[in-house]
C-alpha cells in the first residue's frame, strides 16, 4: 500500500508540474513592446506560421521639420518613402527557429535598411531583438508595454 501511495504522489507531481514547466518554456512574443530607446511601441502577434511586428505608437509622431506625421523617408524606394511610420510592418519572414526564438528579417526605419534578424523571448516582459549584417550583429531589449 505504501508503494502504491508513493507511486500516485509521484505521478500527480509529474502531471501537475508539467503545465508549469511548459509555461516557462512556452513564452509568447504576442503583445505590445516598447523599444529600448523608448521611441516606439511595436505590436507583435502571430501571422501565418510566424510572427509579425507593426509600429503602433511613436514618442514623437509629428515630424518637426514638416509638422506632419512621421513617414518612412529614409526608404530608398520612392513609392515606400511616403508611407507613415505608424502602421509600418517591421518584421518579414519571422519563422520559429527554436523554443521562444524566431528568425527572419527586420526593417529599420532609422536608416531604411532591412537586416537579418533573430527575436527571442527571454522572460515574460523581455524581448531581445537582434539585427545582423553578415557576421556583425547588434541587439536591443524591448520591454512589454501595458498598452
Describe each region flagged by the PLM.
Residues 1-5:
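Positively charged n-region of N-terminal signal peptides that target proteins for export
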Residues 6-17:
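Bacterial N-terminal signal peptides
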Residues 18-23:
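Sec/Tat signal peptide C-region and signal peptidase I cleavage site
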Residues 29-30, 36-107, 114-115:
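Central antiparallel beta-sheet cores of small beta-barrel/beta-sandwich binding domains
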Residues 78-79, 127-134:
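Short aromatic-glycine motifs in intrinsically disordered, low-complexity regions
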Residues 104-129:
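Acidic, glycine-rich flexible loop segments
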Residues 124, 133-147:
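Edge beta-strand at a domain terminus
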